């Protein structure tokens, strides 16, 4: 399934039904009064969060969405039926923003949470509504109101508790695959991962914690280089970031600094999040050189640096213990 995490859509609620002009016509009632009923309310458009959805793909080719109009009133003061509401299911973690003002209209983070965006128009009044002592046979009626029109941006921000970040080819996908049941595409070249991969990691008590492998960030990601903004938004809701560094890269220290710079420039509190620094691929590097890198990273980050091998599954219990202690 294609992963779509942003969509702009136009929502048009239903028009209210018109009121009607009608008079009571019954045998033995030669001068029946007004009996025109009111129109029904137009349908509204309601967004509902659904835990079973992981993408906004449904909105890729369905950019204009309508609700049903209300029905006109009937004789004998019968009100018209309301128009049917349109229910749009979106993934949990979907933020809804007004395209024109940038104002956030809602944030759907809980399964079955709902948000009415476009409200249906009110039904018009039939002539029975206008009966008065001064006018015993009114012939006035009103049309139903137009429904609201909204142009909104849907933006999916994953609800993972732990985000795994780092430059391309640092070993993030291998890490999430050995920690969880996730099966991302893995290969020895940059940008193997083009969409976030999610995996549930089980604690000792059996409870699950959602991890997200965020596609490799690059220098300039905060300004949108590559797919930077698309990737960075998905770590905004995480509680902890695991920063994976390739220990056999040409310059692991510089790689660390690149990601730190991008987190700072993107803002939104990313740099203030709890972070665990991890050196990966320990099995491929000289032990003495590894110690030098660890010391430099710890001096630079002011944090303890963990050393692991995702491929050999070494150091993972210590990493998970650190994660559980911080959540």
UniProtKB/Swiss-Prot annotation:
Mg(2+) binds at residues 173, 193. Its EC number is 3.6.5.-. It is found in: Cytoplasm. Its cofactor is Mg(2+). One of its GO terms (cellular component) is cytoplasm. SUPFAM superfamilies: Obg GTP-binding protein N-terminal domain, P-loop containing nucleoside triphosphate hydrolases. Coiled coil: none annotated. Transmembrane segments: none annotated. ATP binds at residues 166-173, 191-195, 213-216, 280-283, 309-311. PROSITE patterns: G_OBG (PS51710), OBG (PS51883). Residues 160-327 form the OBG-type G domain. The keyword Manganese does not apply. Keywords: ATP-binding, Cytoplasm, GTP-binding, Hydrolase, Magnesium, Metal-binding, Nucleotide-binding. Gene3D superfamilies: GTP1/OBG domain, P-loop containing nucleotide triphosphate hydrolases. One of its GO terms (biological process) is ribosome biogenesis. Residues 1-159 form the Obg domain. One of its GO terms (molecular function) is magnesium ion binding. It comes from the Bacteria. HAMAP family: GTPase_Obg. Belongs to the TRAFAC class OBG-HflX-like GTPase superfamily. OBG GTPase family. An essential GTPase which binds GTP, GDP and possibly (p)ppGpp with moderate affinity, with high nucleotide exchange rates and a fairly low GTP hydrolysis rate. Plays a role in control of the cell cycle, stress response, ribosome biogenesis and in those bacteria that undergo differentiation, in morphogenesis control. Monomer. This is GTPase Obg. It comes from Prochlorococcus marinus (strain MIT 9515). The gene is obg.
């Amino acid at each position: 399934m294609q992963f779509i995490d942003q969509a702009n859509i136009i929502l048009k609620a239903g028009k209210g039904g018109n009121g009607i002009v009608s008079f009571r016509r019954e045998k033995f009632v030669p001068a029946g009064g007004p009996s025109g009923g009111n129109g029904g309310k137009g349908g509204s458009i309601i967004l509902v969060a659904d835990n079973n959805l992981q993408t906004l793909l449904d909105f890729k080719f369905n950019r204009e969405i309508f609700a049903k109009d209300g029905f006109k009133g009937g004789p004998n003061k019968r009100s018209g039926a309301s128009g049917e509401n349109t229910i749009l299911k979106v993934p949990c973690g979907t933020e809804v923003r007004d395209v024109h003002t940038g104002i956030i209209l809602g944030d759907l983070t809980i399964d079955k949470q709902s948000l009415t965006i476009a409200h249906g128009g009110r039904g018009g009044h039939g002539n029975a509504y206008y009966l008065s002592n001064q006018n015993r046979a009114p012939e006035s009626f009103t049309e139903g109101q137009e429904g609201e029109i909204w142009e909104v941006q849907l933006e999916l921000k994953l609800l993972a508790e732990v985000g795994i970040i780092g430059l391309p080819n640092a070993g993030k996908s291998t890490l999430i695959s050995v920690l969880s049941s996730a099966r991302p595409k893995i290969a020895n070249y940059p940008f193997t991962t083009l969409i976030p991969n999610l995996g549930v990691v089980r604690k000792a008590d059996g409870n699950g914690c959602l991890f997200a492998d965020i596609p490799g960030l690059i220098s300039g990601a905060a300004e949108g280089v590559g797919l930077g903004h698309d990737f960075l938004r998905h770590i905004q809701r995480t509680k902890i970031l695991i920063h994976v560094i390739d220990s056999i890269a040409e310059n692991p220290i510089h790689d660390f600094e690149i990601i730190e710079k991008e987190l700072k420039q993107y803002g939104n509190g990313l740099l203030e999040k709890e972070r665990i620094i991890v050196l990966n691929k320990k099995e491929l590097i000289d032990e003495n050189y590894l110690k030098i890198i660890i010391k430099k990273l710890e001096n630079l980050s002011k944090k303890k640096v963990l050393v692991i091998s995702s491929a050999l599954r070494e150091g993972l219990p210590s990493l998970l213990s650190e994660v559980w202690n911080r959540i």
